[in-house]
C-alpha cells in the first residue's frame, strides 16, 4: 500500500471536501483559513488515505495488442531467456515483468492486464446457463480428449497444462489452472455478478471485469479489434469476437460435436453447446407469453422470439439518412449489405463471393448440398422465418368459412375423448387434413404446401405428435398405380413393419366413400398394425408426389365419410 496526501476543506455547513493543489510546491497549512470562489470561508485539514496497489497473480495470463498471449510476473522469472522478458509500468506506477512464450520485437506493448483473459467464452455462456444433459455430454467429451492426448512437459519435468482446481458444484467438475479462474467460474453457479455498468439507465451486471469492459463498448461504440482480411472492414469489441469472425474466412471449426456418429463441428463453443441440445432434447428457454409457450435451445433465439410479442426493435442502422430498426442484431447485420458493395466471403467450391456468411451458407446448401452452420446464418434463417410468420399474422384476412368432412374416428384406450381425422377445406382455399377432437378443442393440421417440403417422408399425425417415416428407395417401382408393399425406415434408422401402399386406380372405386369426397383422387397407405394414412391427390400422378402430401393417421377398418350440415 502507498500513501497519498490530499488537502481537505471543511465547509461552513460541516461537510468535508477535497482540493487539489493548483501550484506545484505550494503548501496549505493545517487549520489555514481560505476563501472559496463563492465567497464562503473554509478551513484546511490534512488527512492520509490508503490507495491499493494494482494486484495480480504471479504468472497471470495477459493479452498483447497483436492478440498473442503472455504471462505477467512481479519479478523476473528465473531461467527465462532475457530476450523473452519485457519490463512494463502498470497504472499504479509499479513495475512488472512480461514473459513471452516466444521472443517478440522490443516495441510490443501490453494492451491490458486482463484478470479474466481468455474467459470471454465463459462470460457468453453464463448468459445462457448450462443444462445437466449438455454439461454431461461436453464433460464426457472433454475427459476423453484429455485422456487420449499425450501430456507435454517442460524442462523441469513439471507437467504443462495440468489443471489442479476442480469445480465442486454437483454435475459440473470443470478444471482450472488457478484458484482465481475457478472463483470466476463459480459465479456461473452462484449468480454473483460484482461488476456493474454505471451508464445511465443501464445497470447490467457481469461476472467478470472483462465482461463489463466488453459491454461498456456497446455504449461507447469502440471496436478496437479489426479483421486482418484485406477485403473485410469489420471490427469487434473483443479479441474473442475477432477470433470467432476470422474463422469465417479460414473455415476453421475447432469445436466438434461429442455425440458419436454426428461429426459436425462449429466455429464457436456456444454454437456447439446449442447444437448439443438437438441431441439431448433440452429446451431451457420457454416463451412466457400466454397461449404461446414455445421452447428454445438458445437464449438468443428466445430473446428474438419474445420481441415478436413485444414489438421491441432495439437495433438501429447508424448509416446517415437510414435509421431503420430491427428486432435482432442479425437483421441489422444483414441490412448493412445495402450500404456496402464489399463481398469478402468466398465459396470454396465454385469461387463465388458474397457479402454475408448467411448467404454464403445458403448458397452452399442449395448449390453444393453442403450443410454448414454459422451463428450469423442460423440466426438470419431463424429471423427470416419469424418475420415471415409475424408478417403473415398481421396481413392475414379475416378467417374464411371452413367446411369439415370427417373421414374416420380414432379412439385410444388412454383417452376418453375420441379423435377424428378430418379433411378441412376453407372457402376458395386448398384442402387440409387435420386430427380434431369431437369437441373441437385440439387440432393438428398440415397444408399441401407444408407437406411438399417433406419430399419422400410420411408424417403420421397422432394425438402425441408426429412420427416421420422415409421411403427406402422404391420410388421407381412404386410410381405406377396398384398395390405395393415396402418396408419403411424410421428416423433413427430402424426398420418398421411392412406398409401396403394403395395408389390411385381400380382399388379406389367410384362408389368408395373416400373417392366421393369432392370426386378427387385419394390413395391409402395401410400398415400391418392397422394404421392407415390418407393421401389426397390433386394434380400428383406418382406415389412420390402423393406421399409428399401424406396427412393423417387413421384407425384400421373401413373409412367412413361423415358430412357436415354445409354439405361438404
From Swiss-Prot:
Region feature Disordered, mapped onto this chain: 365-402
Cross-link Glycyl lysine isopeptide (Lys-Gly) (interchain with G-Cter in SUMO2) placement: 24
SUPFAM superfamilies tied to this protein: beta-beta-alpha zinc fingers (SSF57667)
PROSITE patterns on file: ZINC_FINGER_C2H2_1, ZINC_FINGER_C2H2_2
Positions annotated as zinc finger (C2H2-type): 165-189, 195-219, 225-249, 255-279, 285-309, 315-339, 345-368
Molecular function (Gene Ontology), one example: sequence-specific double-stranded DNA binding
Residue numbers spanned by region 3 X 12 AA approximate repeats: 34-99
Source species, domain of life: Eukaryota
Pfam family, one: zf-C2H2
Main location: nucleus
Sequence repeat placement: 34-45, 62-73, 88-99
Biased composition (Low complexity): 379-395
GO-annotated cellular components: nucleus
Keywords for this protein: DNA-binding, Isopeptide bond, Metal-binding, Nucleus, Repeat, Transcription, Transcription regulation, Ubl conjugation, Zinc, Zinc-finger
Family matches, as InterPro entries: Znf_C2H2_sf, Znf_C2H2_type
Subcellular location field: Nucleus
Function: May be involved in transcriptional regulation.
Family: Belongs to the krueppel C2H2-type zinc-finger protein family.
The protein, known as: Zinc finger protein 76
Gene giving rise to this polypeptide: Znf76
Amino acid at each position: 500500500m502507498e500513501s497519498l496526501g490530499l488537502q481537505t476543506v471543511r465547509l461552513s455547513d460541516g461537510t468535508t471536501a477535497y482540493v487539489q493543489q493548483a501550484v506545484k510546491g505550494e503548501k496549505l497549512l493545517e487549520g489555514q483559513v481560505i476563501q472559496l470562489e463563492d465567497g464562503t470561508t473554509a478551513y484546511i485539514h490534512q488527512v492520509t488515505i490508503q490507495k491499493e496497489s494494482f494486484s495480480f497473480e504471479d504468472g497471470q495470463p495477459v493479452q498483447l495488442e497483436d492478440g498473442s498471449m503472455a504471462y505477467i510476473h512481479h519479478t523476473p522469472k528465473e531461467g527465462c531467456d532475457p530476450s523473452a522478458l519485457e519490463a512494463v509500468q502498470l497504472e499504479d506506477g509499479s513495475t512488472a515483468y512480461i514473459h513471452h512464450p516466444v521472443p517478440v520485437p522490443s516495441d510490443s506493448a501490453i494492451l491490458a492486464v486482463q484478470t479474466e483473459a481468455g474467459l470471454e467464452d465463459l462470460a457468453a455462456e453464463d448468459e445462457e446457463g448450462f443444462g445437466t444433459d449438455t454439461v454431461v455430454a461436453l464433460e464426457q467429451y472433454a475427459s476423453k480428449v484429455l485422456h487420449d492426448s499425450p501430456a507435454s512437459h517442460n524442462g523441469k519435468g513439471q507437467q504443462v497444462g495440468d489443471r489442479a482446481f476442480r469445480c465442486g458444484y454437483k454435475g459440473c467438475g470443470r478444471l482450472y489452472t488457478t484458484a482465481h479462474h475457478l472463483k470466476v467460474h463459480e459465479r456461473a453457479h452462484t449468480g454473483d455478478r460484482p461488476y456493474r455498468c454505471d451508464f445511465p439507465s443501464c445497470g447490467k451486471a457481469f461476472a467478470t471485469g472483462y465482461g463489463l469492459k466488453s459491454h461498456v463498448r456497446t455504449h461507447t461504440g469502440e471496436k478496437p479489434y479489426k479483421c486482418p482480411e484485406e477485403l473485410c472492414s469489420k471490427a469487434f469489441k473483443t479479441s474473442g469476437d475477432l477470433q470467432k469472425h476470422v474463422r469465417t474466412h479460414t473455415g476453421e471449426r475447432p469445436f466438434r460435436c461429442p455425440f458419436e456418429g454426428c461429426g459436425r463441428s462449429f466455429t464457436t463453443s456456444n454454437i456447439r453447446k446449442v447444437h448439443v441440445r438437438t441431441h439431448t432434447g433440452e429446451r431451457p428457454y420457454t416463451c412466457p407469453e400466454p397461449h404461446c409457450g414455445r421452447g428454445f435451445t438458445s437464449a438468443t433465439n428466445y430473446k428474438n422470439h419474445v420481441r415478436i410479442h413485444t414489438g421491441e426493435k432495439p437495433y438501429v442502422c447508424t448509416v446517415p439518412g437510414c435509421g431503420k430498426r430491427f428486432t435482432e442484431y442479425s437483421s441489422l447485420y444483414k441490412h448493412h449489405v445495402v450500404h456496402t458493395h464489399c463481398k469478402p466471403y468466398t465459396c470454396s467450391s465454385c469461387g463465388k463471393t458474397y457479402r454475408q456468411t448467411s448467404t454464403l451458407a445458403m448458397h452452399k446448401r442449395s448449390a453444393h448440398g453442403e450443410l454448414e452452420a454459422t451463428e450469423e446464418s442460423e440466426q438470419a434463417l431463424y429471423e427470416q422465418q419469424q418475420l415471415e410468420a409475424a408478417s403473415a399474422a398481421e396481413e392475414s384476412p379475416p378467417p374464411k368459412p371452413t367446411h369439415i368432412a370427417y373421414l374416420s374416428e380414432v379412439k385410444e384406450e388412454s383417452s376418453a375423448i375420441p379423435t377424428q381425422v378430418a379433411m378441412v377445406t376453407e372457402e376458395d382455399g386448398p384442402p387440409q387434413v387435420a386430427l380434431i377432437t369431437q369437441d373441437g378443442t385440439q387440432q393438428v393440421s398440415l397444408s399441401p404446401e407444408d407437406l411438399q417440403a417433406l419430399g419422400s417422408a410420411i408424417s403420421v399425425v397422432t394425438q402425441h405428435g408426429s412420427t416421420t417415416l422415409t421411403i427406402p428407395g422404391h420410388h421407381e417401382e412404386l410410381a405406377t398405380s396398384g398395390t405395393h408393399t415396402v418396408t419403411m425406415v424410421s428416423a433413427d434408422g430402424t426398420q418398421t413393419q411392412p406398409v401396403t401402399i394403395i395408389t390411385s386406380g381400380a382399388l379406389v372405386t367410384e362408389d368408395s366413400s373416400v373417392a366421393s369426397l369432392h370426386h378427387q383422387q385419394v390413395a391409402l397407405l395401410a400398415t400391418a398394425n392397422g394404421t392407415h394414412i390418407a393421401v389426397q391427390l390433386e394434380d400428383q400422378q406418382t406415389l412420390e408426389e402423393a406421399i409428399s402430401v401424406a396427412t393423417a393417421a387413421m384407425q384400421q377398418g373401413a373409412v367412413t365419410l361423415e358430412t357436415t350440415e354445409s354439405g361438404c
